[in-house]
Amino acid sequence: MDAGHVNVILGEAEDKGLRGSINLVGGAKISFDFNGIGIETSFNTNTKNRTLMIGSGSTVVFTRKYIDCSSIQYIEVFERTK
């Protein structure tokens, strides 16, 4: 997937406080939640080398994952319903 598209999709999800998952080639999934209670989630895309850094955690432990955007098959975003 193009890093620019990844940036737009995750940027919109972050703005709206949504959750979802990044589905990688081979079946692996990385979940995210931009409105998790007690959890901070952030991301950064680098369009030059086509990578995505996504991280989440608390003030004690913050985990980062670095992903080659070409290995992203699709991104699912879930709307919050009441």
What are these regions (language model features)?
Residues 24-64:
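Acidic, low-complexity, intrinsically disordered interaction modules
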Residues 1-29, 82:
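Short glycine-rich, low-complexity segments
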Residues 10-12, 42-44, 75-78:
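Intrinsically disordered, low-complexity repeat segments enriched in small/polar residues
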